[in-house]
From Swiss-Prot:
The keyword RNA-binding applies. One of its GO terms (cellular component) is ribonucleoprotein complex. The lineage of its organism: Bacteria, Bacillati, Cyanobacteriota, Cyanophyceae, Nostocales. Keywords: Ribonucleoprotein, Ribosomal protein, RNA-binding, rRNA-binding. This is Large ribosomal subunit protein bL20.
Amino acid sequence: MTRVKRGNVARKRRNKILKLAKGFRGSHSTLFRTANQQVMKALRSAYRDRKKKKRDFRRLWITRINAASRQHGLSYSQLIGNLKKADIQLNRKMLAQLAVLDPASFGKVAELASQAKG
């Protein structure tokens, strides 16, 4: 068999991992084996939490909308149901922004929703 010289390839592979581990504490940023484990764990967590972030924000928006709609005498589910009946197409992010930044406008939207009950 012929000899395969892989010194450069191996060093590049290790340096790539160590570069990703920059800023980790202790040996996690200097020793290849522990750095490799921590980088894999960090990438797994980052992937998982990108998905979780979407769920977390939706929960936050719903909580804010619920709190604001109860001030106008509607529960969250009633508000959303009535908005659908009235064909008002505001998503939860927009409604939450209105509730926080412009409560008067949110009040108008809630009023329209309560009129659409029937």
